[in-house]
């Protein structure tokens, strides 16, 4: 990974609008019992439905903890990519990379989210 001293804007990059076409979506498999009722069982069922719907039109990558990896892989369809990744919550927006583009190159911007 190359870390730059410039900002994306300085290099001619911008964050595409949410409605812009994009390559794929990153989601985090629900796990935390303090965020999800009843051991996240109902949340996981709904999550699988959401992932399956999104995957009809774009690539989906699901990040799951080591503890939940096999469960996620079993519950999700085979065409949805599952990767093992530790996380603190299901909100990828708070700590996954933000992708920016200059029209031909894509960069990931990292964040140091402190959970407020």
Task: Provide a role label for each language-model segment.
Residues 1-116:
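Histidine/cysteine-enriched polar flanking segments
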